[in-house]
Amino acid sequence: MAVQQNKPTRSKRGMRRSHDALTTATLSVDKTSGETHLRHHITADGFYRGRKVIG
C-alpha cells in the first residue's frame, strides 16, 4: 500500500482543492413563453430559442 513520505503543505492542499468549488446552474428566460429553463435545454412546454420544437 502506498504511504506518503512527507506531509503535503497547506499550499499543495489548497492547490488541489482549487477546482472543488460548486457553481450554480445558469438559467435563462425563454423569449416566447417567459419560462425559466437551463441554458441549451428546451422549456417544459417544448420551446427552444423562441421556437416550438416538441409538441
Swiss-Prot record:
GO terms for biological process: translation. Pfam families: Ribosomal_L32p (PF01783). The keyword tRNA-binding does not apply. Residues 1-27 are annotated as: Disordered. GO terms for cellular component: cytosolic large ribosomal subunit. Keywords: Ribonucleoprotein, Ribosomal protein. InterPro entries: Ribosomal_bL32, Ribosomal_bL32_bact, Ribosomal_zn-bd. One of its GO terms (molecular function) is structural constituent of ribosome. Belongs to the bacterial ribosomal protein bL32 family. This is Large ribosomal subunit protein bL32. The lineage of its organism: Bacteria, Pseudomonadati, Pseudomonadota, Gammaproteobacteria, Enterobacterales. The gene is rpmF.
